[in-house]
């Protein structure tokens, strides 16, 4: 079965959910992703999302089609879709990293490394910078249970 990695960005809708609703959504996605053998990491910075999904290509495409139609965000932009060998983000079925809600030390590291405005880290556009942010977020998750 072809394994793939899909990365996209989007902007939260004005009537975005509360933190509790967001965490409940991540829990539900984790359950769904486990059944579909999909791994994922969702990064939130201000009102911007960056998400990576890895798994069977058909399953990842099905999930992405649902994501595109989800009214909780807009301006969904596909950054990368590629076949993969080993997965980079297979530690979780879904994990959320809110860059605004990081511990101070971690937040300062991210602020030194990435462009930010008014305390909000701007999500990068270049693919190598996107991978850098995703892998830094993964490392942060691995260091914090």
List each language-model region with its residue ranges.
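Charge-rich, low-complexity N-terminal segments
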Residues: 1-145
């Amino acid at each position: 079965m072809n394994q793939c990695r899909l990365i996209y960005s989007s902007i939260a809708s004005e009537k975005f959910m509360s933190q509790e609703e967001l965490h409940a959504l991540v829990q539900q996605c984790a359950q769904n992703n486990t059944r579909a053998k999909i791994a994922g990491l969702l990064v939130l910075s201000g009102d911007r999302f960056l998400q990576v999904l890895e798994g069977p290509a058909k399953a990842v495409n099905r999930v992405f089609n649902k994501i595109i139609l989800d009214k909780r965000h807009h301006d969904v932009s596909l950054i990368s879709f590629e076949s993969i060998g080993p997965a980079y983000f297979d530690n979780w079925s879904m994990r959320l990293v809110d860059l605004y809600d990081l511990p101070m030390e971690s937040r300062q590291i991210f602020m030194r490394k990435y462009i930010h405005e008014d305390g909000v880290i701007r999500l990068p556009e270049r693919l190598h910078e996107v991978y850098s942010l995703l892998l830094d977020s993964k490392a942060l998750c691995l260091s914090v249970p």
